[in-house]
Structures are given as structure tokens and as C-alpha cells.
Amino acid sequence: VLPLSAAAVHKLIPMACDLVAAVLTYRIARKKNASANQAGILMLLMAFNPAIFLNSAGWCQIDSVLSLLLMLVAYFAVCGNWMAVMPIYMLAVLVKPQALMLGFLGLAAIVMALIRDRKCWKPMLIGVGLAVVTAVIVVLPFSVNQGGISWLIDKYAQTLSSYPYATVNTANF
């Protein structure tokens, strides 16, 4: 059982991510020429969605963090900001390995961007470098007493093999 302050922080992180996602929804809607009222309604629908409430505040799931990171990845990919896409996606994969299941969509977006603009490979390469730096910064503190990088590969293999489906909460046949 977590002490009260630890439990509050544990619940606060997913709830804060939900609020940031709601604000991002508003900003994207405004950018796509929605009126302030329309964008506000979308933001409120996102912020007060009962499923989101239950997932983050009720069950204290970290899925809201992953959702926000993937939402940012999609947003920056659409904007063509590959130097932001790559490190944020790496962070999403490090938060929850299930983010790897969307990697093929990212690859398709990269291929399409390269077809449209052959000069975007430079920001993409910089983004890959930033993703590697992100991985090193996040993983290094946990690797001190693990004896190499194999612990992380084993952890990901174990985690991904424990999920035969993309989700365990729906009607998988």
C-alpha cells in the first residue's frame, strides 16, 4: 500500500496527461479552423470522458501518459517536425512497449514524407540521433547494476510476449 502522498503523485501524473491531451485537442481543433466553441466542446468531451476518468483517476493506469505521447507523435508527424517525433516516440516506447505496435504507422508516415520531400531526411536523421540520446538518458540510470543492455531487451521480449493481443480489455476472438 502506497503512502497517501505517493498515491496522490501516482494518480496525478496520468490525470495531468489527460488534461494536457484535452488542451492539445483544443489547439489542434483551433488550428484546423474550428470555432472556439467547437474546440472548447471537443476539449470538454475529452477532459470529462468517463472512460478517461476511470482509467487514470479511478484505476490509476499509466495509459494516459502513453496516449499523450502518441498523440504528440501524431501531431508532430503531421506538422513534419521529425526532430520532435523521433525522441517522443522513443520515450513512448520506453514508457510502454505496446507503443511498438504503432511503429508500422510511423514507418509509413516517414516513407510518405520522404516521397513528398526528399530533403526531410536531414531532420529525420537528427530526430533519430535525439531518440538515441533520449533512450540513453532514460535507460542509463536503470542500467547501473544490470550488467549491460541485455536486461532491457529481455524485459521488452517478456513484456511483449505476455500480450497476445493489442489490448486485454476488449473482446479478442
Residue ranges and their predicted role:
Residues 1-74, 110-173:
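Primarily membrane-embedded glycan-assembly and transfer machineries that use lipid-linked glycans
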